[in-house]
């Protein structure tokens, strides 16, 4: 017994903050808490780091029992000496350990526990505590000083694992379901069941058939047997309830029965009516916009919309105002919500039914026609049972259902609305929106009629004058266009009325430079060239004067063809022509001093026999000269840096924060001078409080920089993806705006 091999294990005890997060398909780290313990750093008693619970168990023992007992014992100091009872033990995977245990492996086990209650936990020094998982993940990286390296690796893997589980139907509810022993209500043993193993040769039965029958009859006699059709099948079930009613008097003790007055029988029905009336009155008070839409009161509806009531608000039944208007056939109310309220015509209720479904169910042909005329309508939208509006109309056959069916059938044959997808040279392609404003980035990319090879280099961006965001494949660009004012307000201090968004086909910020260097397709090279030229002229490619002159001469060769001494004299490069080949920030300050050098290099390039004059070869040569520029291929964010102007005052410098596959770059917004360029591995970052700033620490010169920006959350998430801390296509970090 004493020589049993011990296995090192780590335990992640997690609990949800509330029950609603268990049924969400979207993973949010802030919905969970994790149990960590603080330990002092070696040789630094005052500095501490957080680690996961860890222990050693016998390799051949019952792991589940050992780990649950360890959690129970470890958590007694923080739960009034009662300990925390885990629901189950789930083995996630094994990890290689660092430090003294280098080369060894340790398993990470997940122990889910009950939803967080409102009782305050007792804090004891040296005991574990619960922390919000989102707060932990914000500062977690494999090089973070806040955690041991093993804990960092495990936390990053746990975050990714939880995100994956949220995409699997019923996985999260099953993880936090009560333990099997807690779900057993009654256990009845068959008295005829023989516990002893039957010996070969002779058949021995403990009871005769008559004795068995009499014993079973004495225990329980079933008059009717109904078999559960789900038993033994692979069908998933859910424990979701339709409605919960809590007795307000529960827990108040026994009532004084002498004071209870039973009303006369003729008043019983009236009392039930009163309860219903109270509920209806409460609904009217809480949701006036819903009531006015339900009744078709357009005058009140208009006033409420002017007063700022949201058309997206869902009531206690998870319906929005437009659902009531369509259900009850209120044409003018529906029109007002769509036009004045700018309501999404594809807005879903809690059961995933759309306004078009509600209008089709009721056979309200006029409303169906109104919705089908909306430019953003999704004609092919499906409800929770995968039924189209046409199907539900034919199933219910209400009111003018035949006319409604004709309208829906005609709509399926009509041409689709289109959206313009621009390229950086100003050209565009119109793409059909087969699903209205439910059309995703992935579907638009397929509609661009690009080859599979070309598609992998580019994606859809939404851009206005001062804000550009790369969208994720599952994002719905038309909905981003609709809510652009809100996005601009959330991410900047700009006036949203001055920002007009458009959709662009641009280079994917996640595209590795090694992959781009292998691109041979002329169309892909052209699109990459147009974007690189745009960035150069805007001043985003900060590099040496010599490099800028080389790029300018290449642009002259691409635009004007071979050098002609009669046409391309010194006066040829006036200010207007310079703007098409030189960064705008250099046109007035330096470009006039470069004209001779640019023309000389242009002439050399034209007469050089070693350089192909094929257009896509010249464009590729231009890209080759851009690849070693630090900021090439970066996504740019805006922010402010405070520097000391004197001992008592601070100077505010507005900066661009560039993030690409190379690292992070700070550029002066006014002068386009590159202040800082750090490669991954040479710096650390930390997201500030309320996502309002990001702190950057250079490992080489030990300097700290703080960039104040509303886009700090986006910057950190993109840094994590491009540095490899989270997978590029991982949805583990939920972000409603950008950078997939």
From Swiss-Prot:
GO terms for cellular component: anchoring junction; cytoplasm; cytoskeleton; plasma membrane. This is Krev interaction trapped protein 1. The lineage of its organism: Eukaryota, Metazoa, Chordata, Craniata, Vertebrata. Interacts with heg1 and ccm2; greatly facilitates ccm2-binding to heg1. Interacts with rap1. GO terms for biological process: angiogenesis; anterior/posterior axis specification; atrioventricular valve morphogenesis; blood vessel development; blood vessel lumenization; blood vessel morphogenesis; cell redox homeostasis; endocardial cell development. Its main location: cytoplasm. ANK repeats lie at residues 284-313, 317-347, 351-381, 385-416. The gene is krit1. It comes from the Eukaryota. PROSITE patterns: ANK_REP_REGION, ANK_REPEAT, FERM_3. It is a peripheral membrane protein. It comes from Danio rerio (Zebrafish).
């Amino acid at each position: 017994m004493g020589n049993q091999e011990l296995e090192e294990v780590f335990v992640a005890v997690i609990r949800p903050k509330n029950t609603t997060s268990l049924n969400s398909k979207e993973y949010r780290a802030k919905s969970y808490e994790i149990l960590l313990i603080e330990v002092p750093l070696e040789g630094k008693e005052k500095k501490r780091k957080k680690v996961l619970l860890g222990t050693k168990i016998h390799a051949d023992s019952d792991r589940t029992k050992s780990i649950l007992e360890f959690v129970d014992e470890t958590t007694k100091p923080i739960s009034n000496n009662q300990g925390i009872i885990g629901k189950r033990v789930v083995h996630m995977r094994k990890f290689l350990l660092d430090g003294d245990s280098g080369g060894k492996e340790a398993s990470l086990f997940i122990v889910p526990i009950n939803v967080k209650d409102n009782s305050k936990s007792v804090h004891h020094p040296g005991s574990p505590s619960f922390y919000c998982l989102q707060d932990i993940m914000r500062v977690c990286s494999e090089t973070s000083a806040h955690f041991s390296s093993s804990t960092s690796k495990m936390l990053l893997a746990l975050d990714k694992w939880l995100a994956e589980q949220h995409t699997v139907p019923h996985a999260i509810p099953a993880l936090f379901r009560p333990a099997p022993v807690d779900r057993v209500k009654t256990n009845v043993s068959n008295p005829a069941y023989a516990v002893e193993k039957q010996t070969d040769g002779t058949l021995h039965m403990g009871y005769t058939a008559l004795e068995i029958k009499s014993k079973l009859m004495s225990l329980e006699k079933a008059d009717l047997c109904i078999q559960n059709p789900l038993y033994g099948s692979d069908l998933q079930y859910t424990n979701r309830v339709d409605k919960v009613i809590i007795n307000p008097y529960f827990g108040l003790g026994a009532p004084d029965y002498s004071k209870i007055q039973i009303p006369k029988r003729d008043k019983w029905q009236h009392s039930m009516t009163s309860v219903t009336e109270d509920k209806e009155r409460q609904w009217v008070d809480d949701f006036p916009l819903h009531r006015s839409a339900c009744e078709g009161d357009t005058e009140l509806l208009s006033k409420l919309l002017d007063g700022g009531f949201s058309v997206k608000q869902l009531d206690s039944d998870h319906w929005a105002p437009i659902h009531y208007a369509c259900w009850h056939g209120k044409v003018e109310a529906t029109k007002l919500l769509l036009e004045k309220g700018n309501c999404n015509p594809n807005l879903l209720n809690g059961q995933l039914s759309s306004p078009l479904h509600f209008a089709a169910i009721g056979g309200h042909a006029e409303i169906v026609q109104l919705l089908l005329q909306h430019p953003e309508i999704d004609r092919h939208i499906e409800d929770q049972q995968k039924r189209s509006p046409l199907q539900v109309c034919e199933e219910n056959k209400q009111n003018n259902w035949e006319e409604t069916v004709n309208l829906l059938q005609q709509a399926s044959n009509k041409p689709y609305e289109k959206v313009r997808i621009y390229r950086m040279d100003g050209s565009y392609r119109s793409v059909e929106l087969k699903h209205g404003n439910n059309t995703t980035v992935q579907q638009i990319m397929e509609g661009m009629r690009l080859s599979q090879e070309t598609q992998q280099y580019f994606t859809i961006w939404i851009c206005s004058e001062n804000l550009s965001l790369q969208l994720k494949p599952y994002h719905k660009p038309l909905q981003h266009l609709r809510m652009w004012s809100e996005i601009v307000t959330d991410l900047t201090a700009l006036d949203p009325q001055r920002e007009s968004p458009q959709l662009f086909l641009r280079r994917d910020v996640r595209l590795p430079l090694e992959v781009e260097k292998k691109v041979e397709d002329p169309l892909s090279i052209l699109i990459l060239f147009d974007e690189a030229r745009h960035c150069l002229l805007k001043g985003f490619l900060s590099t040496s004067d010599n490099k800028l002159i080389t790029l300018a001469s290449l642009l002259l060769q691409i635009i004007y063809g071979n050098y002609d001494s009669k046409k391309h004299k010194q006066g040829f490069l006036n200010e207007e022509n310079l703007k098409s080949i030189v960064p705008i920030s250099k046109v007035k300050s330096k470009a006039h001093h470069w004209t001779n050098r640019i023309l000389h290099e242009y002439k050399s390039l034209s007469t050089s026999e070693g350089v192909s004059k094929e257009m896509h070869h010249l464009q590729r040569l231009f890209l080759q000269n851009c690849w070693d520029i630090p900021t090439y291929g970066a996504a740019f964010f805006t922010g402010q840096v405070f520097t000391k102007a004197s001992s008592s005052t601070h100077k505010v410098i507005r900066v661009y924060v560039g993030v690409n596959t190379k690292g992070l770059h700070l550029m002066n917004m006014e002068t386009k001078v590159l202040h800082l360029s750090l490669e991954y591995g040479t710096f650390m970052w930390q997201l500030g409080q309320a996502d309002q700033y990001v702190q950057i620490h250079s490992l080489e010169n030990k300097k700290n920089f703080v960039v104040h920006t509303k886009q700090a959350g986006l910057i950190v998430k993109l840094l994590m993806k491009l540095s490899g801390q989270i997978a590029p296509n991982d949805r583990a970090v939920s972000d409603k705006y950008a950078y997939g």
